[in-house]
């Protein structure tokens, strides 16, 4: 049943289907040790990552997104031509123009859907889910495809051990629509940004400030640069606050959470945030060791794996959290 707010009817939003895709090629820590000055022990201790997936030559972001989307559509029992809207969270689109979303729309044959990209880095899927929620709640759309897809292996400097060990390629997708009943669905989403911290994680070249040039390429300004220590400090401060904000908005306690699905950037960050909240690690679905940091794909992939493993039961309270470059971050609560 829809919720009533004054004279306005609001519909509960639910995730009707999930899907994921990761390329076949596996790059292990031992493989990286042959490329840069690192070791399996060094990477594992600092990040929790054991391996990551790398896209094949000729494979692009939209290719991965389409496979994940088809899995999600199949689970939801939804045809691509019935989609009203496609939201794609990515910082590694096939090309600067047009959006990755319209390319995916064409590949899926989703002719009715309007499509656009969201650029919120690792928090992108959560931003996309929040946008989709507003359209479903107000009755503007009934079937929305939210995708997080990243091909980061082409954006890292493979001589920089501080970044090349972290990232992987993958895609995750969610089909969003009206909840089956009034007791289930998204309870709330909470988004934040702080542009004063933009410099701690960025790709400085390739935009209007530093257009693509021989100098940009020579200085590797087209690659990811980051200050890992500052990112850690920022994340462990704001993510617990975001989860508490969501709980407070719904009159709930930390102990009410059945599962927590985080963006997985670094095991230390996730473990520290859970520790500060008093949430046992057993309530968290972790796959960072197998995929690395897949940015916007991370959250929907984790949700899909937990869903397909039958870990999520009707009525379970699921907390989601993500943080990315910008800085951008947020949280969501959902009654599965």
Briefly describe each language-model feature range:
Residues 2-57, 160-233, 237, 241, ...:
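Condensing-enzyme catalytic core mediating Claisen C-C bond formation in acyl metabolism
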Residues 15-17, 43, 72, 86, ...:
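Buried hydrophobic positions in well-ordered alpha/beta secondary-structure cores of metabolic enzymes
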Residues 20-21, 89-95, 120-125, 148-153, ...:
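Acidic, glycine-rich active-site loops and adjacent beta-strand->loop/helix elements
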Residues 42-63, 90-144, 275-303:
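Conserved catalytic cysteine-centered active-site region
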Residues 68-84, 241-258, 306-311:
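Phosphate/pyrophosphate-binding loops at sites that engage ATP/ADP/AMP, CoA/4′-phosphopantetheine
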Residues 137-171:
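Flexible, glycine-rich active-site loops centered on histidine and acidic residues
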Residues 222, 235-240, 254-277:
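Active-site pocket-lining segment
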Residues 301-321, 327-336:
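Catalytic phosphate/nucleotide-handling subdomain of diverse soluble enzymes
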């Amino acid at each position: 049943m829809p919720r009533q707010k004054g004279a306005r009817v609001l519909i509960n939003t639910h995730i009707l289907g999930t899907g994921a895709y990761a390329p076949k090629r596996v790059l292990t820590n031992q493989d990286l040790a042959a490329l840069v000055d690192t070791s399996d022990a060094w990477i594992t201790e600092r990040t929790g990552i054991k391996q990551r997936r790398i896209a094949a030559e000729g494979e692009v972001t939209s290719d991965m997104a389409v496979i994940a989307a088809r899995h999600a559509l199949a689970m939801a029992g939804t045809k691509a031509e019935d989609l009203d809207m496609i939201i794609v969270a990515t910082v590694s689109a096939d090309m600067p123009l047009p959006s990755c979303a319209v390319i995916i729309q064409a590949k899926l044959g989703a002719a009715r859907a309007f499509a656009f990209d969201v650029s919120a880095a690792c928090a992108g899927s959560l931003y996309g889910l929040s946008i989709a929620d507003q359209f479903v709640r107000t009755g503007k759309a009934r079937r929305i495809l939210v995708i997080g897809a990243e091909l980061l292996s082409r954006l890292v400097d493979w001589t920089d051990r501080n970044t090349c060990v972290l990232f992987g390629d993958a895609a995750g997708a969610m089909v969003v629509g009206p909840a089956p009943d009034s007791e289930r669905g998204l309870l709330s989403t909470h988004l934040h940004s702080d542009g004063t911290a933009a410099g701690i994680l960025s790709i400085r070249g390739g935009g209007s400030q530093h257009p693509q040039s021989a100098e940009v390429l020579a200085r590797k300004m087209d690659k990811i640069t980051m200050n890992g220590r500052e990112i850690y400090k920022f994340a462990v401060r704001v993510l617990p606050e975001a989860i508490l904000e969501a709980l407070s908005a719904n009159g709930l306690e930390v102990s009410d959470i059945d599962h927590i699905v985080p963006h997985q950037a670094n095991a230390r960050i996730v473990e520290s945030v859970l520790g500060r909240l008093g949430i046992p690690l057993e309530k968290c679905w972790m796959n960072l060791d197998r995929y690395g940091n897949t940015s916007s794909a991370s959250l929907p992939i984790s949700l899909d794996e937990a869903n397909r493993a039958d870990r999520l039961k009707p009525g379970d309270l699921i907390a989601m959290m993500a943080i990315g470059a910008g800085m951008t971050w947020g949280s969501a609560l959902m009654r599965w």
